[in-house]
Swiss-Prot record:
Keywords assigned: Ribonucleoprotein, Ribosomal protein
UniProt GO molecular function: mRNA binding; structural constituent of ribosome
PANTHER family from the UniProt entry: 39S RIBOSOMAL PROTEIN L12 (PTHR45987), LARGE RIBOSOMAL SUBUNIT PROTEIN BL12M (PTHR45987:SF4)
Oligomeric form and interacting partners: Homodimer. Part of the ribosomal stalk of the 50S ribosomal subunit. Forms a multimeric L10(L12)X complex, where L10 forms an elongated spine to which 2 to 4 L12 dimers bind in a sequential fashion. Binds GTP-bound translation factors.
Record gene name: rplL
GO cellular component: cytosolic large ribosomal subunit
Family: Belongs to the bacterial ribosomal protein bL12 family.
Protein name from the UniProt record: Large ribosomal subunit protein bL12
GO BP annotations, alphabetical order: translation
InterPro entries: Ribosomal_bL12, Ribosomal_bL12_C, Ribosomal_bL12_C/ClpS-like, Ribosomal_bL12_oligo, Ribosomal_bL12_oligo_N_sf
Amino acid sequence: MAIAKEDILEAVGAMSVLELNELVKAFEEKFGVSAAAVAVAGPAGAGGGAAAAEEQTEFTVILSEAGANKVSVIKAVRELTGLGLKEAKDLVDGAPKPVKEAVPKAAAEEAKKKLEEAGAKAEIK
C-alpha cells in the first residue's frame, strides 16, 4: 500500500519542532545525507550598487528585549512561531534573537506589533 504525498505532508505539518528535528536526524542517518544548507557565492564585481537599490522583499523580526512581562512575551513568541514552551522561553531568555525570518513586510510588521503589545522590544531588519 503506497502512502500519498498529501498524507505525508499532513503528518509532517502536525509534528512539533522537536519531532521534526528527530525526523530530520533519522533521514540523515538512513540515507547518509546532511540537512546543512549549501552556501552559494554571489557574483563578484561592480554590481553592488544595483543590489542596494532593489527593494527588500523578505524581512527578519528580531526580539531585542523581553521587557518586564516575560510570560506575555513567551506566549506571543509561541503564537508567532509554533514553538513549544521551553523553546519559546529559551528564545526569549536569549534575546536579542530572530523570531521570524524571511517573511513578507506585512507579516513582519504584524509580528513586531504582537511582540510590542506583549511588552517586548522588537525590530525589523
